Curated annotation (Swiss-Prot):
Domain of life of the organism encoding this protein: Archaea
Protein name, entry field: Small ribosomal subunit protein uS5
Taxon lineage: Archaea, Methanobacteriati, Methanobacteriota, Stenosarchaea group, Halobacteria
Family designation: Belongs to the universal ribosomal protein uS5 family.
Entry's Gene Ontology molecular function annotations: rRNA binding; structural constituent of ribosome
Species this chain originates from: Halobacterium salinarum (strain ATCC 700922 / JCM 11081 / NRC-1) (Halobacterium halobium)
Domain S5 DRBM: residue ranges: 48-111
Gene behind the chain: rps5
Length: 212
């Protein structure tokens, strides 16, 4: 693996990665050490794709007058089980996007995928392994395993996040103000986070070909 010679790690996990003691993202997350350096993700998951889900202009009155900032909502992923989400604010759109991408790297999760639908028995990691739910603001999102070939049965925002996570097929159910992109995207990410945090029984791993 090629490492960035100019990067000087500031955390224990960063040092382990740079020294080659931790060589993949799954191992890094399993250490339980906090992920506080985006360079760790750059090293272990190079070439991540990113998607700007929403750009909003936020105005605020200060003593010196009206101040304008941009808020960007971004999702990142390798389209093979890893996905991150974050919001970024800056005076410039480009700066807000870059800040969101850097924070999204720190929020990266390993999604549990598998062939979890009773309607399918292909054994491939094409859908979520188990039913999961996520909430953000007034929005609730439920993700359910779907048979291979169904596709992503959900809104555009949900689809973008799931595609970056490497989910090809899923049933979704949502409620609340789903037109609010920031909450819709965050609720979807939180549902995926639930899959990564769930303790999947061994028999379920075997039956559903769960990839964690």
């Amino acid at each position: 693996m090629s490492y960035n010679d100019t990067w000087q790690p500031k955390t224990r996990l960063g040092g382990l990665v740079q020294d080659g003691e931790v060589e993949d993202m799954s191992e890094a997350l399993d250490t339980g050490l906090p992920l506080k350096e985006p360079e760790i993700v750059d090293q272990l998951l190079p070439g991540l794709d990113d998607e700007v889900l929403d750009i909003n202009m936020v105005q605020r009155m200060t003593d010196s007058g009206r101040r304008v900032k941009f808020r960007c909502v971004v999702a990142i992923g390798n389209r093979d089980g890893y996905v991150g989400y974050a919001e970024g604010r800056d005076d410039q759109v480009g700066g807000a996007i870059q800040k969101a991408i850097e924070v999204a790297k720190l929020n990266i999760i390993d999604v549990s995928r598998g062939c979890g639908s009773w309607e399918c028995g292909c054994g491939r990691p094409h859908t979520v392994a188990l039913k999961s739910t996520g909430k953000a603001g007034s929005v609730d999102v439920e993700l359910m395993p779907a048979p291979r070939g169904l596709g992503l049965a959900g809104g555009e925002t949900v689809q973008h996040v799931l595609e970056l996570a490497g989910i090809d097929d899923v049933w979704t159910r949502s409620s609340g103000k789903t037109r609010t992109t920031v909450n819709f995207a965050k609720a979807t990410f939180n549902a995926l986070r639930e899959t990564s945090e769930a303790r999947v029984p061994q028999h379920a791993r075997e039956e559903r070909e769960v990839i964690e």
